[in-house]
Amino acid sequence: MFASKLDSIRERCSYRKTILPKYETEILTVLSFYPELDSTRIIFKEATIKASLNARPKVGSLFFRRRKNRTYVIRIKPNTEDSVATLDQAGFNAAVGVLGHELNHVVDYSNRSIFGIIGRLFNYTNKKGKRKYEAEIDRMTIEKGLGWQLFDWEDYVFNKSNAKVKYKAYKKDIYYSPEDLKSLINQGNPKN
């Protein structure tokens, strides 16, 4: 039964997507929450990056394609010895939660002009701007119905992963803690 549901989700959600087979179930599951991205080009790939995951538009598609034809890349850090918290060590729900967070970056970028995206980049030049932007993305994730999955990711990062103290301190400065997420989810209105 699950296989037939996965086939149905794959048929609907994999159009214009490059999906890593290793994370196919998690990626297809989270894509099913984002019908507005059904025709959006998204490449999921492993990459050596400092963060666990990140999402961004492909630079060439910003300049040479219309907004609806842009390509976005979600980069996933593979498990290495110097690793931060990684997707392959998190549970299914945690993986779905953080992938949902990254897809909300894609939703945000897809609704912006090139100048709006550049403005978002400026948010990342200071801690206050970065914190505000990531809080907005987390609230979007909760509004999509993925709050508990995002909670599982943050709980994994802070309490179960082998992430270094420095990485956990960075996460604490920028992102909601598991307790903050639980409070927002229980409020039922993440805009408060």
Please describe what each predicted stretch is:
Residues 1-65, 191-192:
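A metal-dependent hydrolase signature that marks the N-terminal structural subdomain at the beginning
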Residues 14, 85-90, 121-126:
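Short, flexible/disordered intra-domain loops and linkers
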Residues 93, 108-138:
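Post-HEXXH active-site segment of zinc metalloproteases
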Residues 102-106, 140:
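Short alpha-helical functional segments enriched in proximate histidine and acidic residues
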Residues 94-102:
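Short alpha-helical catalytic segment bearing the HExxH-like zincin motif
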Residues 54-93, 109-110:
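Active-site scaffold of zinc-dependent metalloenzymes
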Residues 23-26, 95, 133:
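Stable alpha-helical elements in mature extracytoplasmic
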Residues 124-192:
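Metalloprotease/metallohydrolase-associated module, dominated by Zn2+-dependent proteases
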